[in-house]
Every structure is written in structure tokens, then in C-alpha cells.
Swiss-Prot record:
Changing D315A: Loss of activity. Fe(2+) 1 binds at E189, E215, H225, H311. Homodimer. InterPro entries: Cupin_2, Haem_Oase-like_multi-hlx, RmlC-like_jellyroll, RmlC_Cupin_sf. Its cofactor is Fe(2+). The gene is sznF. GO terms for biological process: antibiotic biosynthetic process. It comes from Streptomyces achromogenes subsp. streptozoticus. Binds 3 Fe(2+) ions per subunit. Two Fe(2+) bind the HO-like central domain and one Fe(2+) binds the C-terminal cupin domain. Fe(2+) 3 binds at H407, H409, H448. Residues 397-459 are annotated as: Cupin. This is Nitrosourea synthase. Residues 177-328 are annotated as: HO-like. Its EC number is 1.14.13.250.
Length: 471
């Protein structure tokens, strides 16, 4: 043993990490799209590889910057890496998409993804280390008291999402945008959870598998929860093929879904998943009851809410099962030392839910405000000409059909059209037509894109930081 070389843990950072990310994302299936939607092709995901060489992946953002563009880019990357473990086929069949199928599941694509995954996870979830503290001495009794103190039943007050949708200028548009955010999770429901039912760890494993069986409709496809969600989407005029609306997924929606893949993929975080499982199953009862009422208020009797009403019953059972049949036996078997991780999983998930509520509410407000933000162009542009803000400017010339796939900026920007016509996209079903001399204020962290609708469009992007300083 004296001649054994020293062990060097794997680590990727700096230029080597950036190059590895670019190598992964330049796979042709990850290139920009010529359309806002993906059409029944679960292997194509727009990662905007042309931007990735310019991002810093080493400095973990704090919560205040977690909705910046680099985080969105990382969440899109992680979604693609995680989902290479799952089996996807187009609803219309594989014919004509065989090359994309092979490119997505190839050993090279999967190996490149796994190589960058730990660094991407550090970037995506590292901020939670500063957001959650589980110090002190924990016992089975204090854990029970903590779980009893959690308010999973909800109150009478409207949630931020309910306020955003019901207060929107276009409630149906807002509700569709909301439903689309769940597609990465609900269409492959329980897939992250499946990562934790493999292996050998005693009775709790069998209890967890019972939860999975319920999610999969007891082996009956028509009652599988993802099938129920497809019907919900279709009942409000949306398509149900996987990742059709990829470009409309918000940063926080991918963050929430990826969190469970992160916990499930890294088994050293197993007990965090146990905590997150308990909280999500317990709180989903109130969430689904509210979702049923909300969708019926917006769409009337035409909406199919069976997905949500089914969960009202089943998740009452799952919450009790997670506590009595999974958490309690695991603590008895492995001791109080695992309790801080269980609590951490709950608290981290609660932080992510807060971020998700904020992100979605801000996006709906941004979509509703498009006419006013277009009007703001003139005074903001005048302020720039007067020198109120010394803003960097990008001069762009693009041909007809050039699609700027959805992204966001880390500060406010002003889009100014010099000549030509642009369709400015601010969300699903939300767009402006901008002509020469017009423009729009682009708010920090808000998802948007653009399409050129003239033979040529000349425009400018002014990085103003805070548009109010131009007024």
C-alpha cells in the first residue's frame, strides 16, 4: 500500500469548466430554434451555446442574483443533463427524429453532461448554504414538534400566484403561463423520486415505492398523474408534448424541478429528499385545492382539473405515509444525526417555493405591463440622449426570421428600433410589434425574446442598469 498514488478528488473550474460546458452545449440538438415552440421533439432544448463562453461559473450567486441569466443558463443545462437518465419518446413516434434520439442518449452526450454536473449543481444550489441553518441539537421529539409547527394547511389569504393570475389583465393567458411552468415536473412526474427507490435500505424503501406506485396510477396509464396533467393542458388549449414550451420556462420553475433531481441524483443528500418529500406531499393538498378553484374561476367548466383534485385525496395519505412510514423508521434506524438533513430538505424547498412565487408574479406583471413599457421607451431614450445615464450599447443588424431565443438580462435594458420591424416576446401569448423609432424597456431578470419580421432590422440594446435613472 505504500506505493498507492494519492487520491485526487475530481474538480472542474475556471477555463476548463467553461470549455467543458461549451463542448456539451454545442451538440446540435441544443442549438437555437427557428420557432418559439418545440414540436413533439423531447430531445431538442435551446441552451444558447453562443452565450455560454462568456459566463462565469465559478462564483456562486447569492439569492439576490439567483434569477440572473447565468442561473437560467445553468438550470437549462442541468435539466438536459438530468433528463438524459429518463426515457422520452415523441408522442407521434420516433420516425424522422432518430438522429436527435441518438444524439441525446449517446454515451458522449451523457458523459459530457456528468462531467460538468457537479460544478453546475454547486452554482445552482450553493446559495442555499447561506439561506438555511439547521444548527443545534435535534432529537426525535424536537423533530416531531418542528413538523407539527409547519403550516401546510394554508390559510384563507390568496397566494402570490393567485393574486398574480386573478389580478392579471389577461387571466387566461396568465393561467396558461402558470400551467406551462409545471410541464418539466408533471409530465415526467415522480421521475426524480424513482432515483431513491433503487438499492437496499429496508422497510422505508418499500413505503417510498408505494408513493411512486400511486403517482404512476397503479400501473393504469389513464390514471397516471402525468396523463391527468396532459388532459389539464389540452382542456385549456395547450399542447401536451414534452418541452414544447421550453422557451417559456422561467428560471425558478427549472430551479424547483431540478432541486429534486439534484437530491435524487446525489445520494449523500438522501435525507434532504426525505424532508422535501414530506413537505411537498403535505403542502400539495392545499396547493391542489387552490389550483382547482383558481382554474375553474378563470376557465369555467371547460377546464379539466382532475390532476389537482386527485392529489387532494392522495397527498393527504402521502403526507402521513412520509412522516410515519419513512421519516420515523429512518430516524429510529440511523439515529438523530440524520435529522438536520431532513429539516434542511424542508427548509431549502420552502426557500425555493418563495423564489418561484416571486419570479412568476413578476413575470405576469411584466407581461401585463408591456404596453406601458413600450410607452416608456420615448422618455427613457430621451434621458439617454441627454446623458442622464452612460449606458453601454450594442448595435445589431438582423435578417428576417432571426429568432433571439428567450433569455433575460442582469439589469434593465432599453431596446430601440432604428429601422425595420421586430416582434418582441415577453411570455406565452404576450408580444409587442415594434417599428422604427419605437422600443421597449426590458426589466431585469424578465424572460423575453425577439423575432425579426422585416427583411432587415437594425436595433440597439442600451444596458441602462435601472431605467428609472433615465427619467
Amino acid at each position: 500500500m505504500s506505493h498507492v498514488p494519492p487520491h485526487v478528488p475530481f474538480e472542474l473550474s475556471g477555463a476548463e469548466l467553461r470549455d467543458a460546458i461549451v463542448q456539451y452545449a454545442t451538440n446540435p440538438i441544443y442549438h437555437d430554434n427557428l420557432d418559439w415552440l418545440n414540436h413533439d421533439n423531447p430531445y431538442r432544448r435551446q441552451l444558447r451555446p453562443q452565450v455560454l463562453p462568456h459566463l462565469d461559473y465559478d462564483k456562486v450567486p447569492g439569492r439576490e442574483n439567483i434569477l440572473n441569466y447565468a442561473s437560467l443558463a445553468v438550470q437549462r443545462l442541468l435539466t438536459s443533463v438530468y433528463e438524459a437518465d429518463l426515457v422520452f419518446f415523441p408522442k407521434s413516434g420516433l420516425k424522422g427524429k432518430e438522429e436527435d434520439f441518438r444524439a441525446f442518449y449517446s454515451p458522449a452526450n451523457r458523459a459530457l453532461g456528468e462531467r460538468i454536473r457537479p460544478a453546475l449543481e454547486r452554482y445552482a444550489f450553493g446559495f442555499l448554504d447561506d439561506e438555511v441553518e439547521t444548527s443545534g441539537t435535534w432529537t426525535a421529539q424536537s423533530l416531531d414538534a418542528y413538523l407539527d409547527s409547519l403550516d401546510t394547511a394554508g390559510g384563507a389569504e390568496q397566494s402570490p400566484v393567485e393574486k398574480a393570475i386573478l389580478g392579471s389583465a389577461d387571466r387566461e393567458r396568465a393561467a396558461r403561463m402558470w400551467l406551462v411552468q409545471f410541464a418539466p415536473d408533471f409530465l415526467s412526474e415522480a421521475s426524480p423520486m424513482m432515483r431513491n427507490v433503487l438499492g437496499y435500505y429496508g422497510p422505508a424503501q418499500s413505503e417510498w415505492f408505494k408513493v411512486v406506485i400511486d403517482e404512476y396510477g397503479y400501473g393504469v396509464h389513464d390514471t397516471k398523474h402525468s396523463t391527468l396533467f396532459e388532459r389539464t393542458l389540452e382542456s385549456v388549449g395547450l399542447e401536451s408534448d414534452l418541452h414544447r414550451y421550453w422557451q417559456y420556462y422561467l428560471n425558478s420553475s427549472l430551479l424547483l424541478n431540478n432541486y429534486f433531481h439534484y437530491l435524487g441524483k446525489n445520494h449523500e443528500l438522501f435525507f434532504r429528499y426525505v424532508g422535501a418529500l414530506y413537505y411537498t406531499e403535505s403542502s400539495l393538498v392545499d396547493f391542489c385545492r387552490r389550483a382547482d378553484h383558481l382554474l375553474r374561476e378563470v376557465f369555467g367548466d371547460t377546464v379539466d382539473t382532475t390532476y389537482f383534485t386527485e392529489h387532494i385525496h392522495i397527498d393527504q395519505h402521502h403526507g402521513r405515509m412520509a412522516r410515519e412510514k419513512i421519516i420515523k423508521p429512518l430516524v429510529e434506524a440511523h439515529g438523530d444525526g440524520i435529522i438536520p438533513e431532513i429539516v434542511r430538505g424542508i427548509e431549502e424547498y420552502r426557500v425555493l417555493l418563495e423564489i418561484g412565487d416571486f419570479d412568476f408574479s413578476e413575470q405576469i406583471a411584466w407581461m401585463d405591463a408591456q404596453p406601458e413599457l413600450k410607452k416608456l421607451h420615448d422618455p427613457v431614450f430621451e434621458g439617454l440622449k441627454q446623458g442622464k445615464v452612460d449606458a453601454p450599447v450594442a448595435h445589431l443588424v438582423e435578417p428576417r426570421g432571426e429568432l433571439s431565443n428567450t433569455h433575460c438580462h442582469d439589469g434593465d435594458e432599453l431596446c430601440h428600433i432604428v429601422s425595420g420591424t421586430m416582434r418582441f416576446e415577453s411570455g406565452l401569448g404576450s408580444s409587442l410589434t415594434l417599428q422604427a423609432g419605437e422600443g421597449v424597456v426590458i426589466k431585469r431578470n424578465r424572460l423575453h425574446g425577439a423575432n425579426i419580421e422585416s427583411d432587415e432590422c437594425v436595433y440597439e440594446i442600451h444596458s441602462v442598469g435601472d431605467y428609472r435613472k433615465c427619467l
